[in-house]
Amino acid sequence: TPVCSPSRAALLSGRFPQHTPVVNNNIKLDDKIVTFAEVLRRKGYATGYAGKWHLDGDGKPQWAPARKFGFTDNRFMFNRGHWKKFEDTKNGPRVAPRRNGRPYYGVEGADEKSFSTDWLTDKVIGFVNANKGKPFCYMVSYPDPHGPNTVRAPYDKMFANVRVPIPASVNKTRAQTPAWAAKAPRVTADTIRVLMPKYYGMVKCLDDNVGRILAALRQNGQLEQTIIVFTSDHGDLCGEHGRLN
């Protein structure tokens, strides 16, 4: 679906969103839903989850939701948000950047240990190493690539000189736009040229970190015995039709 929660409900349950009953964002997954993780947990698999969940209402970030849906180790699961920097504390994980005492989407000072994509990958590798030789299922849900289009160095400037293609549909008039989208903010070609190199950087950072997971599995001798599914809850318009999201 075009939005997060219904897609996630469908991926986890194998049902159409309307039967979960998550038909829009910030709706709680029905307690009766049996996820693939719950099926595997019952079969003796070690299960875990890290990253964005978006199936427990409007809590934000809301770490480690009480309803686990089969993901036994959900310490690094958070319900909502596209956070850019995390840290471990004696009281558990938290969003590192604070503004007026509240978490926000800042990327300042993020590095290969604290940037969200890298931090979550470390949690995956830790779980993989802890369960070497055992059946396991771990799901990691990276917030990126997603707005805000920011990423840590060196990815933030890696594609600065790339020529960004501008979609023809960016210049659609209001009359050419469906009524439901006509009042939404529109982006210009100049905005696309600024934001897309950072988007490419987010994708490259993600790609490198997936490579780290594969390397860890290979080093442990687990790669050939592991099924890896790479998917997404939805895409990004990247300027098509004058929209980003």
Labelled PLM ranges:
Residues 1-245:
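Formylglycine-dependent sulfatase
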